[in-house]
């Protein structure tokens, strides 16, 4: 779907809610994967994803035409924040490498599970802003879209991602972060 097509679909869905289906079908898997990575629980991810699309449908009239994906992920970001507040527990991360297709051997599953645990623990070492940037990048958003979600300029997102990658590289090689402001 091109941006102009999305705008047309959004405008049509404002008048006819059943026309929201193509937008839902296009973005559900991405939003659900993002929620799952943030929550680590498939049931909670499904619940929050449902809330995201419910809010999106009821708030279509507020969409201003930039990028529907950015707008939708901003709703997802806010829904997750609300979920964490309601749950009052520390945010958990999961599964930055999710790609289970049912075709892997038990050994491959074990390796994939360990890789997910490693990525999760590495991401948990990042400052909150860098972690959010990396999670949204893993969800497939561009720097501009991440900026719209987090209320920052694309250049600031690129810098945060660069710093996160340097920090992750240091963590992987055992050097950790030795210089710089890692916010």
Which positions does each model-derived feature cover?
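Internal acidic/polar
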Residues: 3, 82, 90-116, 142
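A short, charge-rich alpha-helical start-of-domain segment used by transcription regulators
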Residues: 10-33
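Sigma70-family region 2
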Residues: 14, 40, 50-68, 86-88
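Short amphipathic alpha helix immediately N-terminal
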Residues: 24, 125-145, 149
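Arg/Lys-rich amphipathic alpha helix in sigma70-family domain 2
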Residues: 37, 62, 74-94, 112
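Hydrophobic positions on the alpha-helical face of helix-turn-helix-like DNA-binding modules
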Residues: 52, 75, 133-134, 146-147, ...
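Short, Lys/Arg-enriched C-terminal cap helix and immediately downstream tail that follows
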Residues: 85, 126, 165-183
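DNA-recognition helix of helix-turn-helix
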Residues: 144, 150-175
């Amino acid at each position: 779907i091109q941006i102009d097509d999305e705008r047309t679909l959004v405008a049509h869905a404002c008048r006819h809610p059943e026309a929201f289906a193509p937008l839902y079908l296009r973005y559900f898997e991405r939003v659900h994967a993002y929620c799952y990575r943030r929550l680590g629980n498939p049931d909670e991810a499904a619940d929050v994803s449902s809330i995201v699309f419910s809010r999106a449908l009821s708030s279509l009239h507020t969409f201003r035409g930039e990028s529907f994906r950015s707008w939708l992920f901003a709703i997802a970001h806010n829904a997750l924040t609300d979920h964490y507040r309601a749950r009052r527990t520390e945010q958990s991360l999961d599964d930055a490498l999710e790609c289970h297709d049912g075709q892997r051997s038990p050994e491959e599953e074990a390796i994939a599970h360990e890789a997910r645990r490693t990525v999760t623990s590495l991401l948990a070492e990042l400052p909150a802003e860098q972690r959010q940037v990396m999670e949204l990048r893993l969800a497939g958003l561009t720097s501009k879209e991440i900026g719209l979600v987090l209320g920052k300029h694309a250049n600031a997102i690129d810098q945060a991602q660069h710093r996160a990658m340097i920090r992750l590289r240091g963590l992987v090689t055992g050097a950790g972060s030795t210089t710089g402001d890692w916010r």
